[in-house]
């Protein structure tokens, strides 16, 4: 049996931080994304989830339910008939929530400047990160996720608990 000696002369190992930083670190490193692929950009989003780019190492896991997601990734052309459904999905996501608009069609409507196309997802829901390109490479999407992680780490953790009314 091996004997281990611990030298406490230099003090105990202590980590000093705040609760806000700890919560934001946890949030930024465990992003559960709602993969909302509407057109060709969804192919690049699926490639980003594969073994070559391995988004799991960043803590990003794709989910099918908005109730289990914190990040909504809109990739592709959004039609006006589909806009109400998109808003409903966004409203079903728990707070805090973030949105990434991926590709030219999601950002500005792309080449589809018609009456039936929403000319930018930000007209329907608030967007945090825009990824340009047609279709953007997985590296661009990866960079956008890293920017979102930095943004989350800088935000203040909300601890507001609304009192429940009994009457």
Swiss-Prot record:
Cofactor: [4Fe-4S] cluster
UniProt membrane topology term: Peripheral membrane protein
GO biological process: aerobic respiration; electron transport coupled proton transport
Keyword set includes Thylakoid: no
Binding site for [4Fe-4S] cluster: 40-41, 105, 134
The UniProt record lists the keyword Nucleotide-binding: no
Signal peptide extent: none
EC number(s) reported in the record: 7.1.1.-
Gene Ontology CC annotations of this record: plasma membrane; respiratory chain complex I
Entry's localization field: Cell inner membrane
Keywords: 4Fe-4S, Cell inner membrane, Cell membrane, Iron, Iron-sulfur, Membrane, Metal-binding, NAD, Quinone, Translocase, Transport, Ubiquinone
Gene3D superfamilies referenced in this protein's UniProt entry, alphabetically: 3.40.50.12280
Catalysed reaction, written as an equation: a quinone + NADH + 5 H(+)(in) = a quinol + NAD(+) + 4 H(+)(out)
Enzyme class: translocase
Purpose of the protein: NDH-1 shuttles electrons from NADH, via FMN and iron-sulfur (Fe-S) centers, to quinones in the respiratory chain. The immediate electron acceptor for the enzyme in this species is believed to be ubiquinone. Couples the redox reaction to proton translocation (for every two electrons transferred, four hydrogen ions are translocated across the cytoplasmic membrane), and thus conserves the redox energy in a proton gradient.
Subunit structure: NDH-1 is composed of 14 different subunits. Subunits NuoB, C, D, E, F, and G constitute the peripheral sector of the complex.
Homology family: Belongs to the complex I 20 kDa subunit family.
Protein name, as recorded: NADH-quinone oxidoreductase subunit B
């Amino acid at each position: 049996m091996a004997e281990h000696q611990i030298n406490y002369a230099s003090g105990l190992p202590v980590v000093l931080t705040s609760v806000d930083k700890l919560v934001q670190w946890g949030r930024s490193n465990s992003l559960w994304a709602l993969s909302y692929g509407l057109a060709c950009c969804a192919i690049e989003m699926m490639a980003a989830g594969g073994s070559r780019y391995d988004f799991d190492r960043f803590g990003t896991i794709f989910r099918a339910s908005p109730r289990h997601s914190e990040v909504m990734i809109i990739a592709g052309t959004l039609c006006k008939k589909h806009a109400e459904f998109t808003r409903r999905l966004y409203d079903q996501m728990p707070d805090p929530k973030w949105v990434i608009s991926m590709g030219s069609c999601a950002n500005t409507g792309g080449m589809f400047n018609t009456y039936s196309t929403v000319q930018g997802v930000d007209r329907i829901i608030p967007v945090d990160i825009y990824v340009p390109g047609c279709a953007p490479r997985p590296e661009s999407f990866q960079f956008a996720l890293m920017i979102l992680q930095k943004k989350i780490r800088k935000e203040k953790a909300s601890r507001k608990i609304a009192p429940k009314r009994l009457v």
